[in-house]
Structures are given as structure tokens and as C-alpha cells.
């Protein structure tokens, strides 16, 4: 039976969907059958970030209405057969799928996959509550900015109130030089405020923009960028592996391939 993890954030624009795409692909590369559920109805982007937008024929909404079978709506990634996407409808609003319907979709998938990752709409409105309904665990994505952290704190409280106790923190778009100059909150600052376990730290890098524009998750790179390696490590931590966090202050791009072999084994290259 699958682990059901919702990827959420308080504030929009913190990179939540990028996180979902890369964690999903990384888990699939680790050998886990992984299904990604785009719950951001009306504003779907997960298909774009995975490069699957031209293959969307049916969405979750057609499954719920009986217009198609679940298997017809699921899109299998040709680069990684362990990964499938259930896309959201683009021309509907967030109220089009209820919490009970989201639970129904998850129940259709839960016995056939090892991981279900739900890409949750930003904010705390109806779409958020519908998306977190089926989840057992949550990853809260924030950037090290005070507004994003404050919104993340609010989301953590709502997740706990809805019975989700396994909540992890992912700090995205960290700029080590700005932290060093005291112009950005450090990871320690964010952890002190939010008081939940840290699962990942992803540095800011222009390669992330290139990756999203191309529809190619960073973890597919043969020679991993620093963010790509950080995403792989995050997936391994989600899987229960103990992996030290990278020292982003002093890290250079040169040893990435060597470190990847050390942490993940040559079979993942």
C-alpha cells in the first residue's frame, strides 16, 4: 500500500510543483512505483514541469465523471516507467473536486503504487483542504523569506488540525552567500520558527529555471547539478535513508558525480 504524501506550501511561488516533479522522479529512479496527482485544479503545471503536457487527453475530472477509466487518464513517463501522472483539469475551478472525490481517486491508486505524491494548491482555501484530505504525511515547502515562513507556519497548524502528524520541512531557493551576508534567513532560522523536522534544502540556481522550461526534472541529469543532487538526497531521506545535508556554503560543482556515487551507489548513475 502506498505512502500518501501531500506537497504543500502557504505561499504561492515557492517552487512546490518543482519539488513534486523532482521528488517523484527521484523516487521512481530509486525503483518505487510512484504516482503524482496534480490537485491544483484550474492552474495545473505539473504536466509542464514533467514535459508531459502534449500527452494529456483525460484528467482526474473525467475519471470522476465516468467519461474515462483511471488507466486512460494516467500518463506514464517514457523516460522512467515507474512514474505516472494524473493531471488536473485546466479549465475548472478548485471547487470542482471535493475532498471525498480526492479520497476516491487516491483509493483507486493506493494499492498499485509505493508512493502517491499530491501536488497541493498554494494557500489555505477549499482546494488546499480537498488536497490534504487523503494524505498521511506532508512536506511543507518554503523559501527563506519571512512572508513565506509565516504562511508555512499557518499551513503546518492546519495540517496538524486535520490529523496529519508526519510533517517535514523543505527549504527551497536558499542563497548561501546571502545567508552569509545576513541578508537572508538561514535554514536554522527557518527551523527554529517552524519547529518541524528538515527533509531537504535546495539551493537557488539558474539550472532550475532551465529544467522547468524544458520539462526535464533535474534528477534526470547524468551529471547532477547541486539542486539535482539535493533533490535526490531529499527523496532518499523520504525513503528513510540517513544522508547528511550538503554544506552549501563551501560546496563546488566539481565533486557532484563522485558524491552521488558515494551516497546512492553506481547503479543509479
Swiss-Prot record:
CC terms in the record's Gene Ontology section: chloroplast; cytoplasmic side of plasma membrane; cytosol
GO MF annotation list: ATP binding; ATP hydrolysis activity
Main localisation: plastid
Compartments reported by the entry: Plastid, Chloroplast
Disulfide bond sites: none
Residues the record lists as binding ATP: 11-18
Listed GO biological process terms: cell division; negative regulation of cell division
Family annotation (InterPro entries): CobQ/CobB/MinD/ParA_Nub-bd_dom, MinD, MinD_FleN, P-loop_NTPase, ParA/MinD_ATPase
Keywords: ATP-binding, Cell cycle, Cell division, Chloroplast, Nucleotide-binding, Plastid, Septation
Family: Belongs to the ParA family. MinD subfamily.
Record function comment: ATPase required for the correct placement of the division site.
Protein name per its UniProtKB record: Putative septum site-determining protein MinD
Organism of origin: Guillardia theta (Cryptophyte)
